Amino acid sequence: MRIDPVSGEVLAGPLEPVYVYEAPVRLWHWVMMIAMMVLVPTGYLIGSPPPAIGGEPAFSYFFGYIRMAHFIAAMVFAVAFAVRIYWAFVGNKSSRALFIVPVWTGTWWKGFFGQLGSYLFVKEDDALWVGHNPLAQFAMFAMYALGTLFMIVTGLALYAEQWGWGTTPMNLMGWVFVLFGDPQMVRTLHHLGMWYLLLFTVVHIYMVFREDIMSGATVIGSMTNGMRMWKREPRA
């Protein structure tokens, strides 16, 4: 099987299964998914709290539990992303695709516009790809990787705020408030970032199912067993 070394396009058969996503990458994917399932509802409630919480105040710690769940999930989210960055250096080529987009090559751009036309249903593109196709790779980097980094930085800054100026957390993260003007702006941007990543997640799920149905390769299965398998031969 012949594969383009830069874009990952399958150029010629005979086709054979390819081990694409290593176990740490697959584990990271599902850990981040679970963390987001906690972060989104708790983050929404923190940003838009209920007007009142019933019950005896001495026994009601409802909002404290919400904050605690958000903070724990956020730390898992941040540590998992840091480990994912580390694995990009020590893992296989597909593990680096999330962070390195080969925009300097013509074959990548050809695949990018081919996939864009296919997703818009204006042209038929039957290329096969090992790992992410160029359009998916660009979206994963520009929307998910950068969006996740933004959420981690602003989230750590908001977490540090409770310690007060002059403390070690604020000495490390206080520059974020200086950069964006004030804590309220950071809080607003962090809240908007939640909707941004949630929108990406919806689009991501749609594209994954679409690719698994319409493309010539397994997509959902590869994130469970790591293997990319093929349903047809590559285009001539």
What positions do the PLM features span?
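Membrane-embedded alpha-helical bundles that constitute the cytochrome b-like, heme-associated redox core
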Residues: M1-A236
